[in-house]
Structures are given as structure tokens and as C-alpha cells.
Amino acid sequence: MIFMVIKKIFGENFNFNKNIDIKKIFKLDKNVKKDREENESYLDALKEIYEEIKNLEIYEKMTIGMAEIIIGYDNVEKTKKYIVIEPILTKEEIKLFLKLRKVVQALLDVPVEEIDKEKLEDYLKEKIKEIFDDLKLTLDDVTRHKLIYFLIKYLIGYGKIDALMKDENLEDISCTGVGKPVYVFHRKYEHLKTNIKFETDEELDSFCISLAQRCGKSLTLANPIVDGSLPDGSRLNVTLGRDISDMVQHLQ
């Protein structure tokens, strides 16, 4: 189980380790397939978005980064919703993203000083572009922008809930377990159900551990509850009810 009270957060800061052989780590076909109509995962994602918004009476729409936010009332479920619509990655783009993430992670070193998040984000974007050029990847502009967006989101952002973290109108973000929707408390619309879920125990545990580490604390069997402060002073409360020692080992 996880419950979070978060207002405004910034990512951890890193320097690049230049003694890494990028090409040795990164082995893949340089040509990324572009035929999205034949990509089942892409079409499934489109259908999922349609199902989320087809019954909505829309209150408000806005954009956060590359994410479109739709707030409205679902006339079938009889509940208010906060829908996050992000760029869709095809199967080939997902494979490319996962390999690129490994490369960038290999280039990241231990944090040495506090850096403004905006400067860090710009710094990472430039480094990622350099990696693209070094590997001579054949990518269109749309694919490049999407990959950069997701790399930033998962490397220094907050993964699945990154867009929620960046919405200044949200006061609380909470989740009560695997397969259950994340809920938010909005200053104007109050309690809203999102379309974001953590699909597996491993995914949720990994996320909890990451948040705890940003508070300078650890989640263990002996210490399954963390109540702490994130770097900007926001409060975090996390409770886990399963063995996470394997997840700690995985993250290390």
C-alpha cells in the first residue's frame, strides 16, 4: 500500500561519467519502424484513451510538457476524473527507449552538488541528443522528442505520475495498491480519479523505494513504513506490506 502527500518535487542531480563506451552498451538496429497502423500496442493504447474520455463531460483541458490533461465528469461511472494523455510509444520505440535508458543510466554518476532542476533537465536533453548523434540513429523529429520526453520523465522525474507532480493545482496524490487507480486532490475540483495505475507489485514497490530514497530513508521488512520529507519540504507517507528486499537489491 502507498499513500503520498506531495505538492512540488524536483529530481535528483547527476554528473555524467565520461568513461563509458556507449556503443558497446548500445547494440540495436539503427532503423526504427514507423508503421504505427500495424502496431498492435499502439492501436490498443489509442483504444484505451478513447474508452477513458468517451463518456466525459469535460470541465477543463490543459497541457503539461507533452502530456495533455483532461478533467471532467464520467457520466457512466458517476465520478470526476483526471485523465493524463501522453505520447504513445510503438513496440519498436519502447525497445529503443529501454536501451537508451540503460545507456544514459550508465553515464550517470553519483550526485555531487545541488543543481536547479530546469538546468539539469536542459543538460540531460543535450547529452541525450549527443548520444543520438553518436549512435547515428535514424529517427524522425516526433520520435526523437518522444524518446527525450520519456527519458527525462523516468530518469529524473517521477515516472508514471510525473505529470501529476508538475500540476501545481494538485495537493495530494495517493494510491492504495496494485491495479488500483491513483487519486488526486485538486484545489478546484477536489477528489479526482486518474487513469494511472501500477500494474504489478514489483512496479509499485520499486516506485515506493525510489520515493523513500529521495527522503533519505530506506524501506525494509524491519521498517515497512516511511514518513518523511521530500527535498522541497513536501510530506511523504509510504506503507508496504510485502517483502521488498529483492527490490532493494534490484535497484542497487
Curated annotation (Swiss-Prot):
This is Uncharacterized protein MJ1288. It comes from Methanocaldococcus jannaschii (strain ATCC 43067 / DSM 2661 / JAL-1 / JCM 10045 / NBRC 100440). One of its GO terms (molecular function) is ATP hydrolysis activity. Belongs to the GSP E family.
